[in-house]
């Protein structure tokens, strides 16, 4: 009985540790640079939402975002009041919920533009 219990305990311990190491941990290291205007109130609320999900942000205020949008090739019909850029260069335009940003960043996207 003791051998069976020890084996079962060991197997469960291995299982727990292996599943923890396989889980993505994007929040701990992910930084988004958020380009916005200094007067936009909804951007501040979105940044708070993002930070509450565990993502880190750095904010850069601009009087106009036209040049930023052009730099990242964001077409006029897709432009919003702020642009978030991950360290890997992924662009998040507008009020994207944090759950989708976390999900996207935890997956591989070899063909993303």
Regions flagged by a language model, labelled:
Residues 4-15:
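Bacterial N-terminal signal peptides
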Residues 70-71, 77-113:
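Thiol/selenol-based redox catalytic cores and closely related redox-interacting motifs
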Residues 31-32, 55-57, 88-91:
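Short active-site oxyanion
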Residues 43-86:
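N-terminal, post-signal-peptide region of Sec/Tat-exported proteins
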Residues 38-41, 65, 89-92:
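Solvent-exposed loop/turn segments at secondary-structure junctions
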Residues 25-53:
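Local sequence-structure signature of Cys/Sec-based thiol-disulfide redox active-site neighborhoods
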Residues 18-21, 28:
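Boundary at the C-terminal end of the N-terminal hydrophobic targeting segment
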């Amino acid at each position: 009985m003791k051998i069976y219990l020890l084996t079962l305990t060991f197997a469960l311990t291995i299982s727990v540790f292996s599943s923890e190491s396989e889980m993505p941990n994007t929040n701990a290291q992910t930084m988004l640079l958020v380009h916005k205007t200094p007067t936009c109130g909804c951007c501040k609320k979105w940044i708070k939402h993002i930070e509450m999900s565990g993502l880190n942000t750095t904010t850069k205020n601009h009087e106009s975002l036209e040049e930023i949008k052009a730099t990242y090739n964001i077409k006029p019909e897709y432009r919003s009041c702020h642009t978030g850029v991950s360290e890997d260069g992924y662009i998040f335009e507008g009020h994207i919920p944090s759950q989708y940003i976390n999900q996207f960043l935890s997956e591989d996207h070899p063909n993303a533009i």
